[in-house]
């Protein structure tokens, strides 16, 4: 029998601003409940998660405002691009996330959406706290200083 080759991880969408706008406390991997046309459209790589967030409703975690565009080859069976999508997590993880959202005022933001080795669409979620303006400036100053240091060290030799 021939063995199936492991597929490489394919990143579909990434939220690059998340690490700048939020201080990330913890990360989780969650499955996403999708329809067939959503999976095919996500494989095309045109999805965006930059304006999306995760919210809790009735003891479940939902991905809100993520854009998976309509699949061009699907006609009347197409999906709604910005519909809420249920996230698949263990009950213990769901309880931990809901507790952090309600008690500590934290936010659930998606960091990246990718297909794993089995071909399943996964979402990397982060439990994060929003940064204030002065925090953002501080991280920008640190980044600029580290760039300047590396330039000086390269110039010296």
Swiss-Prot record:
UniProt-recorded Gene Ontology molecular function terms: RNA binding
Chief localization: cytoplasm
GO BP annotations listed: trans-translation
Top-level taxon: Bacteria
UniProt keywords, alphabetically: Cytoplasm, RNA-binding
InterPro entries per record: SmpB (IPR023620), SsrA-bd_prot (IPR000037), SsrA-bd_prot_CS (IPR020081)
GO cellular component: cytosol
Basic and acidic residues composition-biased segments: 135-151
Ranges for region Disordered: 133-157
Localization per Swiss-Prot or TrEMBL: Cytoplasm
Family from the record: Belongs to the SmpB family.
UniProt xrefs under NCBIfam families: PRK05422.1, smpB
Role of this protein: Required for rescue of stalled ribosomes mediated by trans-translation. Binds to transfer-messenger RNA (tmRNA), required for stable association of tmRNA with ribosomes. tmRNA and SmpB together mimic tRNA shape, replacing the anticodon stem-loop with SmpB. tmRNA is encoded by the ssrA gene; the 2 termini fold to resemble tRNA(Ala) and it encodes a 'tag peptide', a short internal open reading frame. During trans-translation Ala-aminoacylated tmRNA acts like a tRNA, entering the A-site of stalled ribosomes, displacing the stalled mRNA.
Protein name as it appears in the record: SsrA-binding protein
Gene name of this polypeptide: smpB
């Amino acid at each position: 029998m021939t063995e199936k080759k492991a597929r490489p991880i394919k990143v579909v969408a990434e939220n690059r601003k998340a690490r700048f706008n939020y201080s990330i406390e913890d990360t989780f991997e969650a499955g996403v409940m999708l329809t067939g046309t959503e999976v095919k459209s996500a494989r095309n790589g045109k999805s965006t998660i930059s304006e999306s967030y995760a919210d809790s409703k009735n003891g479940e975690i939902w991905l809100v405002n993520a854009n998976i565009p309509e699949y061009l080859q699907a006609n009347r069976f197409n999906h709604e691009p910005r519909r809420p999508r249920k996230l698949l997590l263990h009950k213990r993880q769901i309880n931990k996330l809901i507790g952090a959202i309600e008690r500590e005022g934290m936010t659930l933001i998606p960091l990246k959406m990718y297909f794993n080795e089995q071909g399943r669409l996964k979402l990397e979620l982060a439990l994060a706290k929003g940064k204030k303006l002065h925090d953002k400036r501080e991280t920008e100053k640190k980044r600029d200083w580290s760039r300047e240091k590396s330039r000086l060290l390269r110039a010296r030799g």
